[in-house]
Design a protein with these regions (language model features):
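Conserved donor-binding/catalytic core segment of Leloir-type glycosyltransferases
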Residues: 158-175, 181-184, 197-199
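A short, active-site helix/loop in glycosyltransferases that binds the activated sugar's phosphate group
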Residues: 109-147
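Short hydrophobic beta-strand element within catalytic cores of glycosyltransferases
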Residues: 264-267
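Nucleotide-activated donor-binding/catalytic signature segment of Leloir-type glycosyltransferases, i.e.
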Residues: 209-227
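A charged, aromatic-enriched C-terminal amphipathic alpha-helix characteristic of glycosyltransferases
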Residues: 14-18, 301-334
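Aromatic "clamp/platform" in nucleotide-sugar-dependent glycosyltransferases that forms part
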Residues: 247
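Glycosyltransferase donor-sugar binding loop
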Residues: 41, 168, 195-209, 225
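Short alpha-helical donor nucleotide-sugar binding micro-motif in glycosyltransferases
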Residues: 226-227, 234-239
Length: 345
């Protein structure tokens, strides 16, 4: 098959791009021709021409609103069967946003099938919006670890014995970076020794400016910018704990990698994170700021962190690719009704 993957225009270290590249790699390994095209929400005049030049058998849209809206406006009349992957942003925010919900529903209606990256979110969607959730299936997510070298502690100037917390995420309000700094203020006030590092692209200009100003006032915290996806595994191996403080989440690639590597996870308890973090097994979940502080304090102890170091081997990229292949083949054969496909976490 000739497969087109459409992603929103973002930094190439973003989760959408990491997922798109993994899909591309897995599907090409199975013998398919796959290209990735990015598009802005407004669309570009050249986009339709690029699609026509590639002549795909099927399109995979990553992000129902940010990829689906310009697809409807620029490529709908090309009659290419489309598969849509709903993100956490689509489900947790877009469907409740009057400006987005109608467009997301239109994208779902025109799609041959729709994927979700989390079975917990899929079940919630089925309960709350049954008209959007018929014929649920599971697509097991995969992980491909990069092999580039990255010495995180040397970059930060942090001693080997100092507990190092790492939060990999795009810097925008929903990810809660500033809130996490304020929680860790209380840990620092107790006199505990640690370092808190952030990495990821600045995706919101105003929030990013405030975040960097907050970092400057805390000697125990650092922002190191973007770590290339191919080097993220090496960076994580240098950390003691991986943090996710997102208010809402779909299925974070950073947590998939952390779970695969056996790095203990500290994560806000939401459906996206709960699908990956088994509390007191491979990490700790928290419900509020006080709970986060308590769990972070527990993770300062090396002996306890070792108990949570349990590498997860089930995130097989070959299985993910084969399942995607089956879905896309079905789309080419053009099932008349949209089907919701939920990938497991």
């Amino acid at each position: 098959m000739r497969i087109l993957i459409v992603v929103p225009q973002q930094d190439h270290a973003s989760g959408n791009w990491v997922t798109a590249r993994r899909f591309q790699q897995g599907l090409e390994k199975l013998g398919h021709r796959v290209i990735i095209l990015e598009i802005t929400l407004q669309g570009e005049a050249s986009f339709q021409g690029k699609v026509i030049d590639f002549a795909p058998d099927v399109a995979l849209l990553l992000h129902a609103y940010r990829s689906g809206k310009p697809w409807l406006e620029n490529a709908r009349d090309l009659m290419i069967p489309a598969v849509v992957m709903l993100t956490g942003t689509d489900v947790n925010h877009g469907l409740d946003d009057p400006q987005q919900s109608g467009i997301i529903q239109a994208v779902i209606e025109q799609a041959v099938c729709v994927m979700l990256q989390n079975p917990i979110i899929a079940n919630a969607l089925s309960r709350n919006r049954p008209t959007l959730a018929t014929g649920l299936k599971t697509v097991p997510p995969g992980v491909i670890l990069g092999h580039e070298i990255f010495d995180l502690r040397a970059t930060l100037g942090v001693a080997q014995e100092l507990p190092l917390f790492l939060m990999p995420a795009g810097v925008r309000p929903v990810k809660g970076a500033i809130g996490l700094l304020k929680i860790f203020d209380q840990l620092a006030a107790k006199g505990d020794s640690f370092h808190l590092a952030f990495c990821g692209p600045l995706l919101d200009e105003d929030y990013g400016r405030r975040f960097r100003a907050e970092i400057e006032t805390r000697p125990w915290a650092s922002y190191i910018g973007v770590i290339p996806p191919e080097a993220m595994a090496a960076a994580m191996r240098s950390a003691d704990v991986i943090i996710n403080n997102s208010i809402s989440e779909g299925l974070a690639n950073s947590l998939l990698e952390a779970a695969t590597l056996g790095i203990p996870i500290l994560a806000r308890n939401n459906p996206g994170n709960a699908a990956l973090v088994r509390h007191d097994v491979n990490g700790l979940l928290y419900d509020d700021d006080n709970s986060c502080l308590r769990q972070a304090t527990r993770l300062l102890k090396k002996e306890y962190r070792l108990q949570l170091s349990r590498p997860e081997r089930s995130y097989n990229p070959d299985m993910e690719a084969k399942t995607l292949e089956a879905i896309l083949t079905e789309a080419v054969n053009h099932q008349p009704k949209a089907q919701i496909i939920a990938s497991s976490g």
